[in-house]
């Protein structure tokens, strides 16, 4: 078959043509030349400008707004990742060995602190280091961050490092303040950067953020840091159930426990702060809302990021600066609610009514209800809530605000509120919205309100049958179905089951018909159901409270404890059931024969109990070693003749000191310069 005629050397000729077009080989390289516009904007970096090119009328883009601190190389990443794993394992033999390791990591990280803080893989190491650092190390790291806080608090990973640094530095501000007042000097080797007090370092960090509060207020990451700084300056608890959800999300992971570091108890308590902090707090709060009008402030009330900051601002203003601050026309509360009379169709009243049903704004309304002055709260309740509290309690979102309102009502107002809510009990039970009912019971116990009508309403809602009543309240059928499946019930417990368990626990605290509703139901179920309740991690708390609370009568305890005969060993080896076995000890304080029967069951299964972690705890709590060796002493404890704190056999038998103990005491006394014991 004939072939097409082709010219030899066509590829070489095409290559020569390309070489003729580009005569300068340096143009191919990524280098800036004098013929090209020297702008950082890539649109200006062109290898060739054609004749038909028309330049755009735009300014060069400035890329220097967010600094880039560089990346860790592969070896550094491997080293710091390995160090992070060692800190999390926390398998150091001594604290000294751990402190030496931490200091070596700090030496390796010297000059790379900002890179580590901004690294996705190594920022967690920085948090762990801060959690285990000494005061001088915290000061040293704090001073390295000075000058960069405005950028760090807006960074996805570095912002967490800043929060961790502020939390652990705040623990030592009070102690430094006391030492400064008593003119004591630390005998520590500190470099020039750690000569600054933490008070001064905090003030420097805040000064860096000044002028940017309005933007940072709603910034995704920086807003968390602002909330934390408000708590630090105000001296409010930093790790508290009431503040944790405002500072961080529910997914926030605290690494201090993972590295075996115990936080100062003062972190969960109100702290004394320097006078300069109070001045900085007032200035910071004023600057945060200075450029915002009232309309924008109200818009922040429903903003997912700005709302928590607004909550803290309002809480600090009313609790830290005094209730009289609310009378100031420039106060945050008056700017949000300027109308003092709360007229029905007024702007302030409509704003507060809208917050009831908003999933974000209702949290701000809870803060207002909790911290507002009494005069404002009484007016708010009288005009906006009292006649509508029943309809508010029906709503899933407004119900949380109703709970806060019930906490502040007097006895008479609480009784009238309960009368308004009683018709809504049945629909609330049907929808498993039990928080308002639980709050009614708890506040009724505190205020001394008769809860008989509420018990009758609950009996009507759950039914007269005791077995179906406890099944509906604790959602036992769903729990049994989940336990029969592949997924354990501990991982799939529903919110309805949790709320039902909390309601039952609240009912057990009330003397009278409410506690009898739960107790009669527990007595009516079968033994298998009772054991399944004891082994459920959520509803087992109901059984524990039923056995130990003062509302538990001797007749009820005698009937319920006998149901566990033959099941004690099985429960003692279960993670949740073991707590029920522990509760059976005080429940049988006047039932010695029942307690001895349970002890015999534990002795029979001694080997299995000793091989189990929870089993060993039950063995120790029941003082079974004493039961085997000194039965008389054990019976004395079981009858309550001995102090319940002396259950430990070592505390019961006061043995004379051995020779080695005496030698240790003499050595310790000699080291302290005191007289040796005889």
Curated annotation (Swiss-Prot):
Region (Disordered): 1-24, 477-496
Compositional bias of kind Basic residues: 1-15
First-listed, main subcellular location of the protein, grouped into a coarse class: nucleus
Pfam families for this protein: PUF_NOP9
Any one GO cellular component localisation term in the record: 90S preribosome
Superkingdom of this protein's organism: Eukaryota
Molecular functions (GO terms): RNA binding
Keywords of the record: Nucleus, Repeat, Ribosome biogenesis, rRNA processing
InterPro entries, per database record: ARM-like (IPR011989), ARM-type_fold (IPR016024), NOP9 (IPR040000), Pumilio_RNA-bd_rpt (IPR001313)
GO biological process: endonucleolytic cleavage in 5'-ETS of tricistronic rRNA transcript (SSU-rRNA, 5.8S rRNA, LSU-rRNA); endonucleolytic cleavage in ITS1 to separate SSU-rRNA from 5.8S rRNA and LSU-rRNA from tricistronic rRNA transcript (SSU-rRNA, 5.8S rRNA, LSU-rRNA); endonucleolytic cleavage to generate mature 5'-end of SSU-rRNA from (SSU-rRNA, 5.8S rRNA, LSU-rRNA); ribosomal small subunit export from nucleus
Compartments in which it is found: Nucleus, Nucleolus
Pumilio repeats mapped onto the chain: 108-143, 291-334, 382-419, 524-562, 563-600
Function: RNA-binding nucleolar protein required for pre-rRNA processing. Involved in production of 18S rRNA and assembly of small ribosomal subunit.
Name this protein carries in UniProt: Nucleolar protein 9
Organism: Paracoccidioides brasiliensis (strain Pb18)
Gene designation: NOP9
């Amino acid at each position: 078959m004939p072939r097409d005629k082709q010219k030899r050397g066509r590829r070489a000729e095409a290559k020569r043509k390309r070489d003729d077009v580009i005569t300068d080989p340096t143009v191919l390289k990524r280098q800036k030349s004098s013929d090209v516009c020297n702008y950082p904007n890539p649109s200006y970096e062109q290898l060739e400008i054609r004749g038909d090119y028309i330049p755009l009328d735009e300014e060069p883009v400035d890329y220097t707004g967010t600094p880039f601190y560089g990346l860790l190389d592969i070896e550094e990443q491997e080293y710091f990742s390995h160090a992070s794993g060692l800190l999390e394992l926390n398998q150091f033999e001594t604290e000294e060995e751990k402190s030496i390791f931490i200091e070596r990591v700090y030496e390796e990280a010297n000059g790379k602190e900002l890179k580590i803080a901004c690294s996705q893989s190594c920022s967690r190491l920085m948090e762990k280091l801060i959690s285990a650092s000494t005061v001088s190390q915290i000061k040293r790291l704090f001073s390295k961050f000075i000058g960069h806080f405005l950028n760090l608090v807006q960074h996805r990973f570095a912002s967490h490092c800043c929060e961790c640094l502020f939390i652990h530095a705040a623990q030592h501000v009070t102690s430094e303040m006391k030492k400064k007042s008593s003119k004591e000097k630390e005998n520590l080797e500190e470099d020039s950067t750690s000569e600054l007090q933490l008070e001064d370092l905090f003030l420097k960090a805040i000064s860096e953020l000044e002028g940017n509060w309005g933007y940072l207020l709603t910034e995704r990451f920086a807003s968390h840091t602002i909330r934390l700084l408000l708590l630090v300056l105000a001296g409010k608890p930093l790790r508290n159930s009431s503040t944790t959800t405002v500072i961080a999300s529910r997914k926030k992971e605290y690494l201090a426990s993972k590295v075996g570091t115990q936080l100062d108890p003062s972190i969960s308590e109100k702290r004394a702060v320097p006078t300069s902090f109070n001045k900085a707090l007032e200035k910071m709060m004023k600057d945060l809302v200075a450029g915002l009008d009232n309309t924008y402030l109200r818009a922040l009330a429903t903003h997912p990021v700005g709302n928590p900051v607004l909550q803290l601002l309002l809480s600090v203003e009313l609790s830290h600066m005094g209730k009289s601050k609310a009378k100031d026309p420039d106060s945050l509360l008056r700017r949000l609610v300027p109308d003092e009379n709360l007229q029905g169709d007024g702007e302030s009243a409509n704003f507060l009514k809208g917050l009831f049903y908003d999933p974000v704004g209702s949290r701000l309304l809870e803060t207002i209800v909790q911290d507002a002055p009494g005069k404002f709260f009484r007016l708010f309740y009288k005009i906006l809530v009292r006649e509508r509290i029943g309809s508010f309690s029906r709503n899933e979102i407004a119900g949380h605000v109703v709970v806060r309102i019930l906490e502040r009502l007097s006895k008479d107002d609480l009784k009238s509120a309960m009368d308004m809510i009683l018709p809504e009990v049945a629909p609330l039970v049907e929808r498993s919205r039990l928080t308002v009912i639980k709050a009614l019971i708890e506040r009724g116990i505190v205020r001394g309100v008769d809860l008989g009508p509420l018990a009758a309403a609950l009996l009507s809602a759950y039914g007269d049958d005791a077995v179906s009543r406890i099944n509906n309240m604790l959602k036992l059928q769903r729990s049994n179905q989940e336990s029969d499946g592949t997924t354990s019930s501990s991982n799939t417990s529903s919110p309805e089951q949790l709320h039902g368990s909390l309601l039952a626990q609240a009912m057990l605290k009330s003397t009278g018909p409410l506690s009898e509703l739960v107790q009669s139901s527990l007595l009516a179920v079968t033994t298998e159901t009772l054991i399944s309740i004891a082994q459920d991690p959520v509803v087992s708390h109901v059984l524990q409270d039923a056995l130990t609370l003062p509302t538990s009568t001797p007749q009820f305890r005698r009937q319920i404890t006998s149901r566990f005969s033959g099941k004690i060993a099985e429960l003692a080896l279960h993670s949740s059931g073991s707590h029920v076995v522990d509760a059976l000890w005080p429940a049988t304080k006047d039932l010695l024969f029942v307690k001895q029967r349970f002890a015999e069951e534990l002795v029979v299964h001694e080997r299995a109990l000793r091989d189990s972690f929870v089993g060993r705890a039950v063995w120790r709590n029941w003082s079974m070693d004493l039961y085997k060796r000194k039965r008389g002493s054990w019976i004395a404890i079981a009858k309550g003749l001995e102090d319940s704190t002396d259950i430990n056999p070592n505390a019961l038998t006061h043995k004379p000191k051995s020779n080695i103990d005496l030698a240790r005491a003499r050595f310790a006394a000699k080291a302290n310069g005191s007289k040796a014991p005889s």
